[in-house]
Amino acid sequence: MAKKILVVDDEPHVVKYLTTFLQDSGYETCSAANGEEAFVVLKQEKPDLVTLDLQMPNETGTRFYRNMTKDKELKDTPVIVISGIPGRHLAVSKPIAVFEKPIDRDALLATIRQTIG
């Protein structure tokens, strides 16, 4: 069974790019456009890893991360921050890795494979 990755980003072209790339690399994907939606998808889909943009409307990635780490079932889900704003990763205490947009696909894939296989 393929590992599942939740892609959280408010930019539809980024979501499409990442989900297509991850599916082509052998992973299942699900997605959300903001932190509020992401928390619902996270609870339903129980992905093996989350890629997280931090600056989004409605609910930020930072708030989503705080809510996720308070949930006993979800708090250990690995998170990779993908942000267009340098230094924003500091708002997330323990990401597996941080990537700035535009994304280095090879490095991202290597990090994912090292983290969840």
What are these regions (language model features)?
Residues 31-49:
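Acidic, metal-coordinating helix/loop segments flanking the phosphotransfer/catalytic sites
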Residues 11-15, 105:
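Short acidic/polar segment at the start of the alpha1 helix of CheY-like receiver
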Residues 56:
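Receiver (REC) domain active-site loop signature in two-component systems and cognate sites
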Residues 103-116:
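C-terminal output helix
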Residues 16-24:
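Charged docking surfaces used in two-component/phosphorelay signaling
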Residues 53:
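Active-site residues of response regulator receiver
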Residues 82-83:
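Hydrophobic/aromatic residues positioned on beta-strands within the core alpha/beta folds
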Residues 34-37, 60-64:
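Acidic catalytic/metal-coordinating carboxylates
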